[in-house]
Amino acid sequence: MTVTLRPATLHDVPLLQAWDLLPHVIACTTDDPTATTAFEGTDWAEEIAAASGVSYHLIAEVDGRPIGAMQIIDPQLEPTHYWGDVEPNLRALDIWIGETDALGHGYGTQMMTQVIDDAFADPSVTAIIIDPLNSNTDAHRFYQRLGFRVIGRRTFDDDDCLVHRLDRADWEASRR
């Protein structure tokens, strides 16, 4: 089955809030064993309403059923400066599969491939960065299978992350 990506809308807020309560989503967003919600209680209505070319969310669907989400940001320009000082012309991604029964079917690979292709369709984008938790070794393997390479550990807020990077040249070489 093929994944379709579409812009997130305010109609998706209840779904995103529900996914935030699922243990597998929480486990990918924090190492805090007492956490009861993913993404530190993000206000999804505010996030979606603030969508721009600098930061926006997509919903992944299979046969019209939402199964996951992605966030795409320009880490140099986004207002929270989560990534700190970074070079220009990067994109940063977050991905999560919300529906438990959609895990392990290759949908994440389809989601990432579509978004990576879209990011590199902009000739100014030189690389994509991503920050899985250092403890999330499944995510490390997933990103490395897509061609991302480890840059190193970094703490974001209170999270110990292992930053990965995919350079345009490496992606293009893998697509030949």
Where are these regions (language model features)?
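A short, well-structured alpha-helix characteristic of acyl/acetyltransferase catalytic modules
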Residues: M1-T2, P7-A45, W171-R176
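Acetyl-CoA-dependent GNAT
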Residues: F39-A102, D118, R168-D170
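Conserved acetyl-CoA pyrophosphate-binding loop and the N-cap/start of the following alpha-helix
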Residues: A102, G106-V115
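Conserved active-site alpha-helix within GNAT-family acetyltransferase domains
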Residues: T109-Q110, N134-G152
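Conserved GNAT acetyl-CoA-binding A-motif
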Residues: A119-D131
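Conserved beta-strand-loop-alpha-helix junction that forms the acyl-donor binding cleft
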Residues: I129-H140, F156-D160
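Terminal substrate-recognition subdomain of acyl/acetyltransferases
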Residues: R145, R153-R176
